[in-house]
Regions:
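Short, glycine/charged-enriched hinge/interface segments at domain edges or termini
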Residues: 2, 55-228
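Short, low-complexity N-terminal leaders and the immediately following helix N-cap/first helix
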Residues: 1-68, 95
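A glycine-rich phosphate-binding loop feature that marks nucleotide/adenosyl-phosphate handling sites
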Residues: 25-29, 186, 235
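Short gly/pro/ser/thr-enriched loop/turn and capping motifs at secondary-structure boundaries
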Residues: 11, 109, 195, 260, ...
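Generic structural signal for well-ordered, non-membrane alpha-helical segments
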Residues: 1-4, 8, 21, 25, ...
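Flexible glycine/proline-rich
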Residues: 2, 18-30, 34-35, 48, ...
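Short glycine/threonine-rich loop/turn motifs
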Residues: 206, 212-214, 221-286
């Protein structure tokens, strides 16, 4: 009799990594990456604004405060997904939305809250100029190209279990399919003359085959593909025939038939078909 830890170690010593396969990104939740994923692009691709506000040259805002705003001339506006055609020069500003590329000449973004835009709108003044209420520093509210993921860098490591956040990363890299480890096929076989399939009427003295469904659900829960072999009756020929149906599976789980009773034939059949590495485990219940 061996411990649970020893049993797991022995079982895992027979385990090999399964072959990779490509899976559509939308179907990859819970799958395991088969290889490292490298980025072909910068994320973000260009320097862009982290705030809604005004793209400016920081030195144009020197000394700005709520009591002494710096007035800049507005020369354009740019939204996310577009490139500004104008160039920011000293004393000018471009109204910019979050995610929009930083216009040429700008080195800072002053958020709307640090301008007098709302005051000007309330006074129904045309937005040809803007008052800056706080001095900016170079790089303020700018996300640099490649700040999140740089081109050529590893974005995700092999062996990563894909969660929604990793799927989002892969989508941001333009990956519509990903290399993942094939899901193991796990054959599930219940044994016993007392068992009845849940689709059948229940005769006196019999019980429904519940273990198969519980085990299959566990297989699915942990990423496997259950293959239901049904019920094998308590005789060697029937059990051998059922076990042979699992030859194309990666793993076989049997339920019952492993004690020392006259009808417990699983051990004998397995010994005839292969090698029994261990049999009893020190655990309760067991």
């Amino acid at each position: 009799m061996i411990s649970v830890e020893e049993a797991l170690e022995k079982v895992l010593s027979y385990v090999d990594v399964l072959e990779p396969e490509d899976e559509p990104l939308l179907n990859s939740l819970g799958r395991v990456l088969a290889e490292d994923v490298y980025s072909d692009i910068n994320i973000p691709p260009l320097d862009n604004s982290a705030m809604d506000g005004y793209a400016v040259q920081a030195e144009s805002t020197e000394g700005a405060s709520s009591t002494s705003p710096r007035i800049l001339r507005i020369i354009g506006e740019v939204a996310a997904g577009y490139i500004a055609t104008e160039e920011v020069t000293p004393g000018t500003a471009i109204r910019i939305m979050t995610g929009a590329p930083i216009p040429k000449g700008a080195d800072a973004v002053v958020q709307f809250e640090d301008t007098d835009e709302e005051k000007r709108k309330a006074a129904k003044k045309p937005l040809t100029e803007i008052g800056i209420l706080r001095q900016a520093v170079k790089g303020l509210n700018i996300r640099g190209a490649g700040e999140d993921i740089s081109k050529g860098s590893m974005a995700l490591k092999a062996g990563t279990v894909l969660r929604p956040q990793e799927i989002g990363v892969l989508a941001s890299l333009g990956k519509d399919a990903v290399p993942v480890i094939r899901r193991p096929v796990v054959a599930v076989l219940a044994t016993g003359d007392e068992l009845v399939d849940i689709k059948e009427p229940l005769p006196p003295g019999k019980i429904y085959n519940s273990n198969t469904y519980s085990l299959a659900a566990q297989v699915s829960r942990y990423g496997g593909v259950p293959k239901i072999l049904g019920i094998a009756r308590d005789n060697i020929k029937a059990l051998e025939d059922k076990i042979k149906q699992a030859r194309d599976a990666d793993l076989l789980i049997t339920s019952a038939g492993v004690s020392v009773g006259e009808y417990d034939v699983v051990k004998d059949v397995l010994a005839r078909l292969g090698e029994v590495t261990f049999w009893t485990v020190r655990m309760k219940p067991g």
